[in-house]
Amino acid sequence: MRKITIATRGSKLALWQANHISDLLREEYPGIEVQLLKIKTKGDKILDVPLAKVGGKGLFVKEIEEALLDGRADLAVHSMKDVPTELPEGLEVGIIPPREAETDTLLSVKYDSLKDLPAGAVVGTSSLRRQSQVLALRDDLKIESLRGNLDTRVGKLLNGEFDAIVVATAGLNRLKLSAPKSEILGPPTFLPAVAQGALGIEYRIEDTEIQDILAFLHDEMTARQVKAERGFLTGLDGGCQVPIAAWSQLESDQVKLTGFVADIDGSSPIRMEKTGPAEDAWDIGLALAEEVLAAGAKEILDRVYDKC
């Protein structure tokens, strides 16, 4: 069997994800040779600017996709929440492994929960989605930019730079990171980013051999959830750096999608739901986006883009 090269960012979380897929490949195909190609992306290099102000989509994937296109790598493992809805010609993300937790977690050294934070407490995040939802629940808190890899962000909290931070639960679980105090922030009150907690494997469409090798990793239930949520994001023409959230639930052959858009200060929230056949997940996402836009989301998103 051919030697496989996996393109990945160099952060601890990205390496965990790439090594996780490597381990699964070795278990499935004893003797297979797998190597990692570490690549620095634009998002990794610009750490002194809030993500919303860096601009552009694909901050954490563009350079990795270039390695796929020029043949240096056979596949890439992404956090699906970082992957733009439009991919370069010749590439696809067709393998979606089972999803980890889609929730966020509030970490603190002293405070048990979001409601226990004192007025004026400093909460760290560079996600406009998290900022918007935190302020919708607690408009007396102060949000400050928090950049860096996940272990770096947790370290800043433990060093006393913030009263609390909000990060993805999946990353904490994967790297076994924690803080003295924590609270899960999840649906229905706190909605995740599109495809949060899900991994995606990207490859060249023409490489049918690699697709056959990877097929055992695919989880159709997760794939349908991701399709519904990414359909919603596509319909809103949003990137990962806007206050858009989506959460899909599968019940037998039906998908129930909840979409959320709000201003960055938590005001003017729009939250709507749509249910339909799971096989039509993408179209359900697009349809919900149309309804949310008609309800006022276009004006909200225009304001957000003007501020960025």
From Swiss-Prot:
Residue positions where S-(dipyrrolylmethanemethyl)cysteine is found in the record: C240
Chain coiled-coil ranges: none
Keyword annotations from UniProtKB, A to Z: Porphyrin biosynthesis, Transferase
Catalytically driven reaction(s): 4 porphobilinogen + H2O = hydroxymethylbilane + 4 NH4(+)
CC per GO annotation: cytoplasm
EC number, as in UniProt: 2.5.1.61
Top-level taxon of the source organism: Bacteria
GO biological process: protoporphyrinogen IX biosynthetic process
UniProt xrefs under Pfam families: Porphobil_deam, Porphobil_deamC
Molecular function via GO: hydroxymethylbilane synthase activity
Pathway entry: Porphyrin-containing compound metabolism; protoporphyrin-IX biosynthesis; coproporphyrinogen-III from 5-aminolevulinate: step 2/4
Cofactor: how bound: Binds 1 dipyrromethane group covalently.
Cofactor(s) named in the record: dipyrromethane
Membership in a protein family: Belongs to the HMBS family.
Subunit structure comment from the entry: Monomer.
Function as written in the Swiss-Prot or TrEMBL entry: Tetrapolymerization of the monopyrrole PBG into the hydroxymethylbilane pre-uroporphyrinogen in several discrete steps.
Any further remark recorded for this protein: The porphobilinogen subunits are added to the dipyrromethane group.
Protein name: Porphobilinogen deaminase
Organism whose genome encodes this protein: Maridesulfovibrio salexigens (strain ATCC 14822 / DSM 2638 / NCIMB 8403 / VKM B-1763) (Desulfovibrio salexigens)
Gene responsible for this protein: hemC
